[in-house]
């Protein structure tokens, strides 16, 4: 496997190998005073973030550094992009500089695929990892969500995962639908009709507008942020109305099964799509997701740069 561009790129075997290795990396680092493994020593990883990010950017940087790779950050404000350089020319420059992997977040859907095409050469070019492209995909987020579900519930297969909120603008939702389906979960989307994408009827999901009917049946609930920055019209009457209809309040949380887990990709709009008390409750796995993000991204880098057949952990 050369690139990770979409969650659909992952076979069940690939996804399971990445999740298993993420757990191995987590276990290998427990108790280490210096969190360093030699796995990617001598490799160069470059992050290219053209959109704001905290969790994804930091976790990729930490993942690379914990594996002893050289991690270099390129941003639009601090590079020749600010002078008008195209994404293609930037990518070719970084390939020529000897990057082993390019990790890109970009506002344009399809940017990661373009990067893979532009950087292909007779040696194969660097591995490309999609860290979020527009409203299209965010495959490593789906992997860390799946890992969190597996850790909390024992497995992903056969579990009912309810995804609530702004599905229309959510790359997280698209990647989760694809990966959860691959891993054998049942996926339910709960959203107002205005926040569902065209063609959702062809997705391997059940669609509902009734959050109260779905919560008691859920093994996991993934709450999505309303992405106001991607909206240029009225998708719902008001923030208050949205919260009343689709927010995960403390009262709604009481309808969840005792074993059910609450997920959120962040950043959270507390008080809108999720109540303060719910976000901080024992059923919430939000901080576990962040921790898993580092280990999953370590496993993805290992999978692409070393190979799934190699030993993931060495002292």
Curated annotation (Swiss-Prot):
Gene3D superfamilies according to UniProt: Aspartate/ornithine carbamoyltransferase
Q: Quote the pathway field.
A: Pyrimidine metabolism; UMP biosynthesis via de novo pathway; (S)-dihydroorotate from bicarbonate: step 2/3
Which residues does the record give as L-aspartate binding sites?
83, 171, 225
Please give the name of this protein: Aspartate carbamoyltransferase catalytic subunit
Lineage, highest ranks first: Bacteria, Bacillati, Actinomycetota, Actinomycetes, Mycobacteriales
Task performed by this protein: Catalyzes the condensation of carbamoyl phosphate and aspartate to form carbamoyl aspartate and inorganic phosphate, the committed step in the de novo pyrimidine nucleotide biosynthesis pathway.
The positions annotated for binding carbamoyl phosphate are 55-56, 105, 138, 141, 266-267
HAMAP family named among the record's database cross-references: Asp_carb_tr (MF_00001)
Keyword terms, alphabetized: Pyrimidine biosynthesis, Transferase
